[in-house]
Amino acid sequence: MEKFNYKSLIKYGLIFIYCFFALAFFYTVLRGDLYVNYGFSYAIRMGEVPYVDFNLVILPFAPVLYSLFLMFSKSIIFYYLGQAFLLTLFSYFIFKILKNKAWIYFVILSLPFPTTMASVLFPGYNFLLLFLTVIIIYLEKNNKSDYLIGILLGCLFLTKQTVGGLLCLASIYYLFSDYKKVLKRVAGFLIPILICFLYLLFSHSLYNCFDLCFLGLFDFGHSNFYYDKFYLICFIFAFVVLVYRIIKRPKDITNYYLLLFSSCVYPLIEHYHVSLFFALFFLILLADFNFSKDVSKHSLILILVISFAWVFSEFKNTKIVNYCNLELSIFPARYIESVEKLDRYLEKENKNVIYFLRGSENYFYKIKNDSFITYFDLPNYGNYGYNGTKKIISKLDNLSDVFVVVDESLKNDSNKAQQYIKEGMDLIVKKGKLVKKINNYLIYYIGVEE
């Protein structure tokens, strides 16, 4: 085992600091579903039960793990600190696999274009999917404990049941050559699965979990399929390279992990999911690339130049504002003004409010208001289990004496990548009375039925 000396301590300490600033400042505009992922853990920290109190379409490993970082405070700063810690661990395994080539990999990860590689650094289940897969690849390359690999495969399945479940199939590679390895992995796999089963059983959320995470998949893939031509071409090119690698090196199990990991791009073949695939793709390519020169200094300079250039190019007309639980939030000045106007109006009216905006914006408002997360806050196709659209329409139809805030831009949005349930907005517009318009926000009042 590598001795963890003074220089290593400084190196990983600096990586931790950089990762925190990258999350909080450098790449914040690439945050994607940050508020939703944070919101899952925030809700657990608030004492809510996943699948019962709010909808969640992944198994609970990632939200529960990240909620541990919120043990002492619900602030997003602690969420960033927790992710910076995980990214530091991630970098440790990258160094173990790539040695000096790790710095080249970090330069690739810091790039915000042409694929937004930096977006995969943000906390959430997709990052954990990548992180756990990297650890397993390291263990495979070094013939480490099959029990440990099995436990991590179980955690992968509990992180994202679709991709994680497929990654477990890589162990079939050993089925005929060494079936005892497979049995050990199955034994390890069952440990986290059993713990999760007991958690769901005792929290009375087992059926809801099955409905949302498995039966809802039929709606999700059918309703949400979308591809961007540029990223589809990028993915196809990389996939052809992968197939060539498998043909040339059929005994390299890392190729099969990458092949199965490629399923992460479905059903949304766009910048984020293709970048997630590329994060593992470039790691495996670099592992086979012969390069012994020390490029750490040049790489560090390049990473810092990229980071600061990105900051100066993207942060024009933006402000830093501190909301409750969402300190150091960076938004365009116009958006901050809209938020303040909406808050003032709703506070003056003093009515129950449901935000039926994009999921990330619903979570933003709920978290900054220190409110509980509900089933209305992630109104996307495939997020409500079997016949999910009918379920959420039924919930909306039963509302009374409440303000519902919707986004006018979603009403006529023809963007095929948009997962928002427009049938829900149609019902709100039909049933409610428009009482106020604040920029893009439309506020409807749904009265008490006689």
Q: Predicted segment positions?
A:
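Hydrophobic alpha-helical membrane-interfacial segments at the cytosolic entry of transmembrane helices
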Residues: 12-19, 178-201, 237-238, 297-308
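Membrane-interface transmembrane helices that cradle and orient dolichyl/undecaprenyl
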Residues: 128, 132-148, 240-251, 289
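Loop-to-helix entry region of an early transmembrane alpha helix in multi-pass inner-membrane enzymes
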Residues: 56, 60, 64, 72-89
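Membrane-interface alpha helices of multi-pass inner-membrane proteins
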Residues: 146-161, 166-172, 191, 258-268
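Extracytoplasmic catalytic/substrate-binding loops of multi-pass membrane glycan-assembly enzymes
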Residues: 26-40, 53-68, 334
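Aromatic- and kink-enriched transmembrane "portal" helix at the membrane-lumen/periplasm boundary
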Residues: 63, 76, 106-130, 158, ...
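Transmembrane-helix motifs of polytopic, lipid-linked glycan transferases
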Residues: 81-102, 242-246
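Short periplasmic/luminal acceptor-recognition loop of GT-C membrane glycosyltransferases, typified by
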Residues: 57, 317-323, 329-383, 391-414, ...
